[in-house]
Structures are given as C-alpha cells and as structure tokens.
Regions:
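Chalcogenol-based redox active-site neighborhoods
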Residues: 1-147
Length: 147
C-alpha cells in the first residue's frame, strides 16, 4: 500500500465516460482517491452517496472513486445515484495494484488516500465506515490544514 509521503502515481485509466484520466493531472488540487469493492453493493452505494451529498463542502478538492468494474458499470452507477465526482474504471486492476489495495479476490479494499496540492500522500484511511466516510475525510483534510 502507498505510504504517507509517496507521490501520486503516474497512471492512466478511464473514467465513467470512457475519457482517459492521468492521476498526475490531479496535482495542483487536494485530491481524495477512494477505493471501493463494487458498484451497486449496499456499502459502496452508501459511501458514494455520502461523498455526493457532501460535495458542496469539498470546495476545490478532487474526489475520485475507483473500483475494478468497467466503464459501463461505472456509468450506470454514476447516473443511477446522480453522482457528482469522477469514477475510475480499473477493469485491468492496474490502479488498485499500483496503490497496493487489490484483494486476492480481485476487488479493491475499501481504502481512501488524501493527497495535498503537490501530489504528496498525506493520509490513508484503511478502516472506513461507508455511511459517514465523506465527513471523516473532510474532518481529516481540515485537521491536516489542507482546506
């Protein structure tokens, strides 16, 4: 798993619209990258909706959800739940492997990474409560002086 102090990896993946996203392009803004096991499951849906409902409080902060489903699954998940942040389709599992969160079962662990504006990893949540995770992330960003 990436350790605090690591640079955001230079890796390219597709978003929910099939557009290429280079993670290094997130440098310049505080960035929250949260990994979740699977679209449309109860915990993952609660976590995504928690971020959606709190996006107004994530001013000038990139929020990015990542799981191993494909673009089509992410697009449906995004539209069904009116999500308002980027989802990364890690269907080849390279993003999860790079971040060190791929389970032996082939899905991502529920882990969240907070990067500062310089792209330096400042905090890792490896224990996540999906229902109120967005609020936990906001509190940690504030505690770290990144807001």
């Amino acid at each position: 798993m990436l350790k605090v102090g690591a640079q955001i990896p230079e890796i390219v993946a597709l978003d929910q619209n099939g557009e290429k996203i280079n993670f290094r392009d997130f440098v310049g803004k505080v960035t929250v990258i949260y990994f979740y096991p699977k679209d449309f499951t109860p915990g993952c849906t609660k976590e995504a909706c928690s971020f959606r409902d709190n996006m107004g409080r994530f001013k000038d902060i990139n929020v990015v959800g990542v799981s191993v489903q494909d673009v089509d699954s992410h697009k449906r998940f995004y539209l069904t739940h009116s999500l308002n942040f980027t989802l990364i389709a890690d269907h080849d599992k390279k993003v999860s492997e790079t971040f060190g969160v791929l389970r032996p079962s082939g899905v991502a662990e529920r882990v969240t990474f907070i990067f500062d504006k310089e792209g330096i990893l400042r905090y890792v949540f490896d224990k996540v409560n999906p229902e109120n995770h967005a609020e936990e992330v906001l509190a940690k960003i504030e505690e770290l002086g990144l807001m």
